[in-house]
């Protein structure tokens, strides 16, 4: 069986973690645990996770924007080689929490490094490996940040401490990417109830890969 590479993107507070948890659980019921690989960026193998610790450390406030972009790309390269390519070769369905689009939105747009410039850095890192499908969970910036303030329980990291304009830039970049690549990036209204969002995500996945969630459609 040919592997499938699906990435999940979203502005802060879009509910990506909750959606991914549900999608992963239901997909594992259908295909079996061994056929599904959940992974995240930055992260994956132990080298990428070590880079993640540097990137997310709330004390690293003096990190240069280009350093940040290059570290994300380095972690991604290791992730591609150590995790993603082997999983695809084994025929697995990959559910990846963030990928290249995050770098374009966060470092390219919000850090003002340039979307094309950050894309070029990442082209070198990924060596042509792009998701066949990207699920983008879209939510108005203010609503997303309100959700975080109300419901977040995990540790606040360095990237959670930006100003409102930063998060507006992230969202607008994602929307531009979705408009530019409609065949790959499917935009889901994340302002809806969690059950509705999950249903819409499943529909988008099934439309691309008819064998996924076939019993629900």
Where in the sequence are the language-model features?
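ATP-dependent small-molecule kinase phosphotransfer cores
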Residues: 30-126, 200
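Hydrophobic anchor at the beta1->P-loop junction of P-loop NTPases
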Residues: 8
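Walker A/P-loop
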Residues: 17
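ATP-binding Walker
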Residues: 14
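P-loop (Walker A) phosphate-binding loop of NTP-binding proteins
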Residues: 11
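A glycine- and Lys/Arg-enriched "phosphate-lid" helix/loop adjacent to the NTP-binding pocket
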Residues: 102-172
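Pre-Walker A (Motif I) flank of P-loop NTPase domains
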Residues: 2-5
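NTP-dependent small-molecule kinase module
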Residues: 22-26, 142-217
């Amino acid at each position: 069986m040919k592997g499938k590479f699906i990435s999940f993107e979203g502005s802060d507070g879009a509910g990506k973690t909750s959606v991914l948890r549900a999608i992963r659980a239901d997909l594992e019921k259908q295909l079996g645990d061994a056929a599904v690989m959940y992974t995240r960026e930055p992260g994956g193998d132990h080298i990428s996770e070590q880079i993640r610790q540097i990137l997310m450390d709330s004390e690293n406030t003096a990190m240069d924007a280009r350093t940040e972009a290059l570290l994300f790309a380095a972690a991604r390269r290791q992730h591609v080689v150590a995790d993603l390519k082997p999983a695809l070769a084994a025929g697995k369905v990959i559910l990846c929490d963030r990928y290249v689009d995050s770098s374009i939105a966060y470092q390219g747009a919000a850090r003002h490094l340039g979307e094309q410039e950050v894309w070029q850095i990442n082209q070198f890192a990924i060596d042509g490996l792009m998701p066949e499908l990207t699920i983008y969970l879209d939510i108005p910036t203010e609503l997303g940040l309100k959700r975080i303030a109300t419901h977040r329980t995990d540790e606040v990291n360095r990237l959670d401490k930006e100003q409102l304009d930063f998060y507006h830039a992230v969202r607008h970049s994602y929307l531009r990417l979705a408009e530019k690549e409609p065949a790959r990036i499917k935009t889901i209204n994340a302002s809806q109830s969690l059950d509705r969002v999950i249903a819409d995500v499943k529909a988008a996945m099934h439309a691309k890969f008819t064998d996924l969630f076939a019993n629900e459609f």
